[in-house]
Amino acid sequence: MSVKIRLQRFGKHKKPFYRVVAINSKNSRDGKFLEILGTYEPLLGNINLNTKNIEKWLFYGAVPTLTVKNLINKQNKNNKS
């Protein structure tokens, strides 16, 4: 089973809200997920990620999407400053 870390879209029309989830790569975007790893609100710019659980999934071999990788880097940059 290959696992990806990707975004799941929630919210209303033109008011998106995303969950960062670990999910089987064969499942659909809004399919059954393995674990919720954080949230992202693009309109407010809020990024809340559980870095310990993300590191755990990366250690197990999960592959983050490009967008999730950028969010992780953005949060790490904000935490350092």
UniProtKB/Swiss-Prot annotation:
| SUPFAM superfamilies the UniProt entry points to | Ribosomal protein S16 (SSF54565)
UniProt-listed Pfam families = Ribosomal_S16
Q: Which family does it belong to?
A: Belongs to the bacterial ribosomal protein bS16 family.
User: What InterPro entries does the database record attribute to this sequence?
Assistant: Ribosomal_bS16, Ribosomal_bS16_dom_sf
Q: Which GO terms describe its biological process?
A: translation
Q: Which residues form the signal peptide?
A: none
* Keyword Ribosomal protein included in the entry's annotation: yes
Cite the entry's keywords alphabetically: Ribonucleoprotein, Ribosomal protein
**Official protein name in the record:** Small ribosomal subunit protein bS16
Q: Which PANTHER family match?
A: 30S RIBOSOMAL PROTEIN S16 (PTHR12919), SMALL RIBOSOMAL SUBUNIT PROTEIN BS16M (PTHR12919:SF20)
Q: Which organism is it from?
A: Phytoplasma mali (strain AT)
